[in-house]
Design a protein with these regions (language model features):
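Solvent-exposed loop/turn and edge beta-strand elements of beta-rich ligand-binding domains
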Residues: 1-209
Length: 209
C-alpha cells in the first residue's frame, strides 16, 4: 500500500526547518479474526521560499513594470503561483513546461512587502531566476540568478524523522547565504537583492545584515 500527499501552499503551511507533520494511520481486519490491526507512521514535509528584494539605484523605478520568471533547473519546469495581495506573497500552485503559462512575478508596489517578490511553497531544489522585463530606462539583468536550496532532511528517512535534523542551507550563484526565519521557523527563506541602475545591473546575494 502506498499513499501520497500534497502540501498546500498558503499561510497555514510552516516554512523552513520546523516542517509540516504528515501522519497516516492504517487500520485493517483479517477475515479470520475479530480484532483490528493498526499501523501508524509519520513524516515531516519541508517547504521553503525565496525573499527577493528589487531595488533601483535612483529609487525612481516602477516596480509594476518589473517581471521575473522562476524555473526549476532540475526538472526544467516553470513555477506557477498565485499572489495574495493582502499578504504580498506569491504562493506556489503548480508548474508548467510552457513559458507562456508561467507566472510572471512582479515586486509589490504597495505598503505590504514593498519592492519584494516573496515566493513560498518551493521544494528543496535548484531554481533559476530570470528578469524578463524592467522599467523603461533600466537595463535588464544580463545573467540569470541560480538559487539552490538543500533540505534539512535530505539524508534522513521518514521513519527516523523525530530526531534532530540539520538545518536547511542555500546558495545564490554558488555562494552560501544565510536563510532567514519565517514565523519562528528558521531556515525558511532565501534572501537576495537585485539592484538595477541605468547603466548596468548589480545582483547582490544575502540579506540585510
Amino acid at each position: 500500500i502506498t499513499y501520497a500527499c500534497t502540501v498546500n501552499s498558503d499561510a497555514a503551511v510552516v516554512y523552513g526547518d520546523s516542517g509540516n507533520p504528515n501522519d497516516v494511520t492504517l487500520t485493517w481486519k483479517r477475515t479470520n479474526t475479530e480484532y483490528y490491526d493498526t499501523l501508524t507512521d509519520d513524516c515531516h514535509v519541508y517547504t521553503y521560499g525565496i525573499d527577493l528584494t528589487k531595488e533601483f539605484s535612483d529609487n525612481n523605478g516602477n516596480f509594476d513594470n518589473v517581471k521575473f520568471l522562476l524555473k526549476n533547473a532540475t526538472d526544467n519546469y516553470f513555477v506557477q503561483a498565485e499572489l495574495n495581495k493582502s499578504e504580498g506573497i506569491y504562493y506556489v500552485t503548480g508548474h508548467t513546461e510552457k513559458e507562456a503559462d508561467a507566472t510572471k512575478f512582479s515586486p509589490m508596489s504597495g505598503e505590504v512587502n514593498h519592492g519584494k517578490v516573496m515566493v513560498k511553497g518551493l521544494e528543496d531544489d535548484s531554481y533559476i531566476i530570470t528578469e524578463v522585463a524592467t522599467d523603461a530606462g533600466y537595463t535588464l539583468l544580463k545573467e540569470n540568478i541560480t538559487v539552490d536550496i538543500v533540505s534539512s532532511d535530505s539524508t534522513t528517512i521518514c521513519s527516523v524523522c523525530g530526531k534532530a535534523l540539520k538545518t536547511a542551507s542555500a546558495k545564490v550563484n554558488g555562494k552560501d547565504v544565510a536563510m532567514t526565519e519565517d514565523n519562528g521557523s528558521v531556515s525558511a527563506l532565501v534572501p537576495l537583492t537585485i539592484t538595477n541602475t541605468r547603466g548596468f545591473d548589480l545582483p547582490k546575494t544575502g540579506g540585510r545584515g
